Amino acid sequence: MTSVVSSARRTIRIGSRKSQLALVQTYWVREQLQNSFPDINFEVHTMSTQGDKILDVALAKIGDKGLFTKELEVGMINEEIDFAVHSLKDLPTNLPEGLALAAITERENPADALVVHENFKDKQIDTLPAGAVIGTSSLRRLAQLRNQFPHLTFKDVRGNLNTRLAKLDAGEYDGLILAAAGLQRLGMGDRVHQILPKEISLHAVGQGALGIECRADDAELITVLKAIEHPETRDRCLAERSFLRSLEGGCQVPIGVNTEINGNELILTGVVASVDGQNLVKDTVSGNASDAEAIGIRLAELLREQGAQEILNTIFAEIQRGS
């Protein structure tokens, strides 16, 4: 591809978290860009985020505004790095002033996956015995699974994927609910025991996609980053992020989605659930994919009419109390 970067700019600095998964994702993005722009030197710079440092507290109790992104965003604003690679599900829907979501890469499988201890290899999520201990750090997964499987025991789990799997194999848990995409990217796809269908668990907003963030005024760099954008994934994720933004939810609240595109039609399903799983509202809206953000807003309004705001208000109050 013909270079669109000025001759004075031959090095572009990429910001990444230090986790194994983050680095795998960042180096994948670097490889795609290097293939398209061989004359540019793409350097990876790593940073630790708040979410990487606090591993003994449930995510929902920390607060989630930029938990895995803030330090990278400060680095961009201070021009220490030029762009950052995020798991899109971790990127807040309202970005800091001066930053932009420049590109969204093609999505991996966005579904949640069940990984089980060897004692339960013959079970599925709906056949696990009463009292089986399932690990998840996500209120979204917790709420939906409690709604359908109240006989299971759910326990918080933190740490990187290897740490979580080690805890599972040591018998601390009977099963884990993890993002299928993360397991696949780390070459651990063989650990997936069951892909949870959307009827059981709607995935997180942006799950399975990578979001590339940079300074909004860096038009030259944005042109470079657009080379690895996947338009269909962007439409789907813009609808999902608009839905989440309209509900004023964050990355850690029990809000799940599913998007499908048939021709020009985008179909968005969303759910809002109470943490105990007792209250759950769910519906679907469709429209032209070119109106992705409007579809998200319409779905948020529809769920509000069905009681979603009351559910969210209760959750926010519980989080503030630290319960």
Curated annotation (Swiss-Prot):
Gene3D superfamilies referenced in this protein's UniProt entry, alphabetically: Periplasmic binding protein-like II, Porphobilinogen deaminase, C-terminal domain
Pathway assigned to this chain's UniProt record: Porphyrin-containing compound metabolism; protoporphyrin-IX biosynthesis; coproporphyrinogen-III from 5-aminolevulinate: step 2/4; Porphyrin-containing compound metabolism; chlorophyll biosynthesis
Catalysis performed (reactions): 4 porphobilinogen + H2O = hydroxymethylbilane + 4 NH4(+)
UniProt cofactor(s): dipyrromethane
Cellular component terms per the entry's GO annotation: cytoplasm
Annotated positions of the S-(dipyrrolylmethanemethyl)cysteine modification: C251
Listed name of the protein: Porphobilinogen deaminase
Organism annotation: Nostoc sp. (strain PCC 7120 / SAG 25.82 / UTEX 2576)
